[in-house]
Amino acid sequence: AINAPASGRMAVAEAITNLLAAPIELPRVKLSANWMAACGEPGEDAALYETVKAVGMELCPALGVSIPVGKDSLSMRTQWSEGSDKKKVTSPVSLIVSAFASLSDVRGTLTPQLNATEADTTLVLIDLGKGQNRMGGSILGQTLDQSGDVVPDVDDPQDLVNLVNAVNALRAKGQILAYHDRSDGGLLAAAAEMAFAGHVGVALNVDLLVTEGDGVSDSRMDTGDAKNWAGQVSARREELTLKALFNEELGVLLQVRTAERNDVMQTLREHGLSKFSHFVGKTRPVSSEIDAGKGELQVWRDAKAVFSAPLADLHQVWDAVSWKICQQRDNPVNADAEHAAAGEPTDPGLHVHLTFDAADNVAAPYLNLAKPKVAILREQGVNSHIEMAYAFTEAGFEAFDVHMTDLQTGRVKLEDFKGVVA
């Protein structure tokens, strides 16, 4: 069943995990909320009320963020007739969230682009869904024409607060090389997009994500008679693998140096996140000592590669929809050329090639570093001349206190100054 309050909570949470690529502080985060619903339809008013309550009165206060601005679109339905048949499409309650925050320092902003110069790095998944892998509303479900029953949710706002604090702590230590939130398409899509951006191969390992129970007191893997157990376990493992790769629970994927991953896990432990943080993969840059997986996206389970494909092929598929739209909107020749370059390892993309040394100050030979002299005229009844002199001094001038009698007697000449302030 559709869970309107959960969708609202997830909209806020995903806006924050998107923003977390920058060094944000939660008290500085402000949200713009666009509430959309088909008011008057059965159950929709109640769903809207519950969603507003969940977001505005529960989640946001718990996170310490505010919603100073927003709008509403409360007629989200359309009706028409086809002959004697009346048709109607009604949209579910939706919340569109835009997040913004002022930063004390814009440096330290992270991107999804995998670092290609580090030879040995690890991917760390911080799974705020805590292994529930709820598939309702997922992209995978939609491709199979299924909406699902149980949807992802923000079960504990404190986990999100802890995530922000942990990522900022790791950022301050310089231990995060790349960052991407898990959202549309799940873990596999996030890893693929990071690999596309960096032209770096990735080998994911889902062993820790497909384990159920402890095998002793919790034996969820015991799904039937012993004679069918092997087949049932195999089918269940396939299902769990798909859920691990494509669930869209709240979470983030980090690239860290393998030599520092234990330190990273200790930081996550200090912020209460280690129990649901996992080492889920390794990168395969050109400089990697392991050749298998270079230029590919692989998924490993039980010491076997259950999926492997060249990054270039996956990038072409990933770009296909945008390419088709671009063909209709822009010059088709340019659209085709851009699509052909998608995933090409030798394509440098947008880049800068300077024909000079950026460290050189080309204006230096022409600069006159002498401070211009400026006369601050003073006469009886004048005030603020001291503040004016201070302002010009701070601006790089050499300020002189000049009284009108100085000019009358010839002690000072205006021709000696570059400017006069009166």
Regions found by a protein language model. Name each.
Residues 1, 48-51, 66-248, 257-373, ...:
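Intein/HINT protein-splicing elements and their conserved insertion hotspots or analogous self-processing inserts
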Residues 2-78:
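A glycine-rich phosphate/pyrophosphate-binding beta-strand-loop-alpha-helix module
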Residues 15, 19, 373, 383-385, ...:
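Core alpha-helical transmembrane segments of integral membrane proteins
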Residues 23, 181, 420-422:
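Catalytic nucleophile loop
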Residues 24, 273, 397:
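Short phosphate-binding/catalytic loops that engage adenosine nucleotides
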Residues 254:
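Catalytic core of tubulin tyrosine ligase-like
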